[in-house]
């Protein structure tokens, strides 16, 4: 029975997270995994090639060596184990799941803010501070999106939460009340 990608990612990431936490190497491991993610994202065919059984083992291992060479011992073990079990296509999923665990530990929340006009840096940091206080996060990382249909106000989306303070929504609610 084959495990699905999410299950594989959760198991590997949790094991690595626990190990790095125990060995007091969580921060350096996190930084290293971010770099590894960037390598796989910049080279989208890499994981496929490392898993491609039609390539000679020597060719695949030649692709693997630069990753192992620059890795710390625990990350090197992760890469080698994932490669040995033929799960290189799960590597970014594993790193993404590790990121979730890391963010939970550090109370970091990612949110998307939608406004009618571009926000200034000061406005973004005000929204980050207010939203962090509201959800109990130590840090909020915002990405912003401009949608003129919002008319005014702000919509903040994070995970399964939407805070809609847009003028468009207020107008729609008023319209519904008047038509009721």
UniProtKB/Swiss-Prot annotation:
Q: Does the keyword Cell membrane apply?
A: yes
Q: Which InterPro entries match?
A: ATP_synth_OSCP/delta_N_sf, ATPase_OSCP/dsu
List the GO cellular component terms: plasma membrane; proton-transporting ATP synthase complex
Q: Name one GO molecular function term.
A: proton-transporting ATP synthase activity, rotational mechanism
The protein's topology relative to the membrane is: Peripheral membrane protein
Its subcellular locations are:
Cell membrane
SUPFAM superfamilies named in the record: N-terminal domain of the delta subunit of the F1F0-ATP synthase (SSF47928)
Q: Which UniProt keywords apply?
A: ATP synthesis, Cell membrane, CF(1), Hydrogen ion transport, Ion transport, Membrane, Transport
The keyword Chloroplast appears for this protein? no
Q: Name one Pfam family in it.
A: OSCP
Name the family: Belongs to the ATPase delta chain family.
Family matches, as PANTHER family:
ATP SYNTHASE DELTA CHAIN
Role noted for this protein: F(1)F(0) ATP synthase produces ATP from ADP in the presence of a proton or sodium gradient. F-type ATPases consist of two structural domains, F(1) containing the extramembraneous catalytic core and F(0) containing the membrane proton channel, linked together by a central stalk and a peripheral stalk. During catalysis, ATP synthesis in the catalytic domain of F(1) is coupled via a rotary mechanism of the central stalk subunits to proton translocation.
Q: What quaternary structure, including any partners, is listed in this protein's UniProt entry?
A: F-type ATPases have 2 components, F(1) - the catalytic core - and F(0) - the membrane proton channel. F(1) has five subunits: alpha(3), beta(3), gamma(1), delta(1), epsilon(1). F(0) has three main subunits: a(1), b(2) and c(10-14). The alpha and beta chains form an alternating ring which encloses part of the gamma chain. F(1) is attached to F(0) by a central stalk formed by the gamma and epsilon chains, while a peripheral stalk is formed by the delta and b chains.
Which HAMAP family does the protein's record reference? ATP_synth_delta_bact (MF_01416)
What is the name of this protein? ATP synthase subunit delta
Recorded source organism is Levilactobacillus brevis (strain ATCC 367 / BCRC 12310 / CIP 105137 / JCM 1170 / LMG 11437 / NCIMB 947 / NCTC 947)
- As recorded in Swiss-Prot or TrEMBL, the protein's gene is named atpH
């Amino acid at each position: 029975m084959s495990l699905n990608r999410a299950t594989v990612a959760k198991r590997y990431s949790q094991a690595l997270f626990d190990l790095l936490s125990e060995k007091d190497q969580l921060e350096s491991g996190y930084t290293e995994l971010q770099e590894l993610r960037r390598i796989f994202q910049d080279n989208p065919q890499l994981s496929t090639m490392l898993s491609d059984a039609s390539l000679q083992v020597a060719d695949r291992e030649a692709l693997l060596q630069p990753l192992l060479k620059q890795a710390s011992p625990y990350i090197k073990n992760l890469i080698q184990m994932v490669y040995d079990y033929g799960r290189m296509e799960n590597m970014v999923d594993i790193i993404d799941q590790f990121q979730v665990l890391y963010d939970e530990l550090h109370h970091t929340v990612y949110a998307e803010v939608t406004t009618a006009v571009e926000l200034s840096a000061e406005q973004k940091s005000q929204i980050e501070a207010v939203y962090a206080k509201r959800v109990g996060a130590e840090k909020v990382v915002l990405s912003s999106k401009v949608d003129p249909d919002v008319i005014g106000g702000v919509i903040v989306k994070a995970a399964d939460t939407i805070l809609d303070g847009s003028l468009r929504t207020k107008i729609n609610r008023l319209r519904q009340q008047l038509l009721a």
